[in-house]
Amino acid sequence: MNGVFTVGDLKYLARTGRLSGTAAVIGNVLSIKPILRGNKDGYIVQYKKCRGRKSALNELISLVCNNIVEPEKQIIGIAHADAYEDSLYVMEENPENTSKVRGFINTSYDFCTGSHVGPDTIAMFFMGNDRELQGMK
């Protein structure tokens, strides 16, 4: 199982100690949106940095397309924290590889998880080759 996500505001990562306060302020001013994932050891690690929200959402879609295994047998999970419109965008923006999937499950984060990542967070979950995603920077 692979999971990739992006956050809307870096201050929530700073509040939980995953990012320094200075980096969060600078990142927010420059509209930098990190793409994060869980690694094999269960830690959240940065995969890539994107400039702007749409760029980050498109990168999530690209990661799923490039790493999904047997898409016709899969249901892709999408979780969001008050980002319903963005969750619809990633469902409808179907490149060739995700247009073959059986379907999507779209849900909102629970309060506990949502408080750690903040509003406008969106994640995608899928079965892939390995948790080491192709294209790792």
Question: What is each of the regions a protein language model found here?
Answer:
Residues M1-K137:
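Mixed-charge interfacial surface used for oligomerization/domain docking
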